[in-house]
């Protein structure tokens, strides 16, 4: 009898050891596969696994991103966690996250005033954490709530933010006598001309990135998500050079082109300066848009307009995709204002025979 009890106890111990081994192995393989393995990162990941709550897994992910210097992603995960805790509290069990729970969560976010695109971002980050938990064996396949026939994240179509070439010309000529308006207008125009560059990449440009009359850079947004570094090259047209001459630092090889960063910032302060500049550009450009009767103009508008102006001019979508640094054409298609009102009106007019009043 005692021997049988010992045998059962040994079997249970072996199962625990095997389970722990599989969790550690899965964590190591996942981190190594993403190029982010370190003992600290492994420790953070295993802390999340040991706690067995969604909240703790989020906090482990946030700590992992902070140590990797990925402040933008860290802040997004932190924001998503706050929303989750407003909805379901500070100890969310993995088995509580069901299809019906996700529907209620999406409804809750909608009632908070979030648009579909933002709701989709929250749900995708929750799904990413559950994917980590699934790889670690914490969430069984039968428990996993996302996917075909389960909960499918509804994607927002995306706002059509593109301006016409005529509107961009009016922005370029706009003056109100304010130096701040002139500077932020020029920064916005530089974003547009520089392949719709994101502000996070704009602030990090240095004079050494200009090679043979082209600016060369790798998008910060994709440098951690792709195995091959995709370099974007932008011809420095005279209008861009004029903006550099007007607002840039002295043209020394290691200097930042624009006086936003000074090179002493840690990742968090770099992110904060980027966010501050983005807000400043958006605030000033919103005022410009109102004065010109164009509507709201933002840094996103610059990126969308770059893509759409090229498309209207007949540029190949593959070229536009490469210029934006996208990994697939579908992302680019989302950027393009394919169904603008003017295009719909033109196509509708084709249906009307001559002489039909």
Language-model segments: residues:
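Short, basic (Lys/Arg/His-rich) helix/loop patches that form interaction surfaces
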Residues: 178, 282-322
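Short, polar N-cap/turn motifs at the start of nucleic acid-interacting alpha helices
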Residues: 209-214, 294-296, 315-334
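Basic, Lys/Arg- and aromatic-enriched nucleic-acid-binding interface segment
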Residues: 143-199, 203
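Conserved tyrosine-mediated DNA breakage-rejoining catalytic core shared by Y-recombinases
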Residues: 148-149, 204-246
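Basic/aromatic-enriched alpha-helical hairpins
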Residues: 29-113
């Amino acid at each position: 009898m005692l021997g049988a009890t010992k045998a059962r106890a040994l079997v249970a111990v072996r199962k625990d050891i095997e389970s722990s081994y599989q969790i550690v192995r899965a964590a190591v393989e996942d981190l190594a596969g993403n190029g982010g393995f370190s003992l600290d990162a492994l420790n953070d990941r295993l802390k999340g696994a040991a706690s067995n709550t969604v909240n703790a897994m989020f906090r482990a992910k946030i700590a992992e991103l902070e140590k990797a210097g990925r402040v933008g992603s860290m802040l997004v995960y932190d924001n998503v966690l706050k929303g989750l805790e407003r909805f379901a509290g500070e100890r969310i069990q993995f088995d509580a996250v069901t299809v019906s729970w996700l529907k209620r969560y999406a409804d809750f976010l909608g009632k908070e005033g979030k648009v579909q695109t933002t709701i989709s971002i929250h749900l995708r980050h929750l799904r990413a954490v559950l994917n980590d938990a699934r790889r670690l064996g914490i969430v069984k396949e039968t428990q996993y709530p996302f996917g075909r026939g389960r909960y499918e994240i509804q994607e927002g179509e995306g706002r059509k933010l593109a301006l016409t070439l005529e509107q961009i010309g009016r922005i370029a000529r706009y003056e109100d006598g304010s130096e701040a308006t002139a500077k932020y207008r020029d920064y916005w125009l530089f974003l547009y001309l520089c392949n719709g560059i994101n502000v996070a990449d704009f602030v990090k440009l240095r004079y050494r990135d200009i090679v043979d009359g082209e600016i060369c850079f790798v998008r910060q947004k994709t440098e951690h998500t792709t195995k091959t570094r995709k370099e974007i090259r932008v011809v420095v047209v005279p209008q861009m050079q004029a903006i550099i001459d007007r607002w840039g630092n002295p043209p020394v090889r290691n200097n930042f082109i624009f006086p936003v960063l000074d090179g002493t910032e840690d990742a968090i302060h770099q992110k904060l300066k980027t966010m501050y500049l983005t807000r400043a550009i958006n605030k000033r450009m919103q005022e410009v848009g109102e004065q010109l009767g164009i509507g709201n103009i933002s840094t996103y508008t610059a990126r969308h307009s770059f893509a759409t102006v090229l498309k209207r001019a007949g540029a190949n979508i593959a070229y536009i995709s490469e210029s934006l640094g996208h990994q697939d054409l579908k992302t680019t298609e989302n950027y393009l204002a394919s169904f603008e009102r003017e295009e719909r009106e033109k196509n509708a007019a084709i249906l009307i025979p001559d002489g039909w009043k």
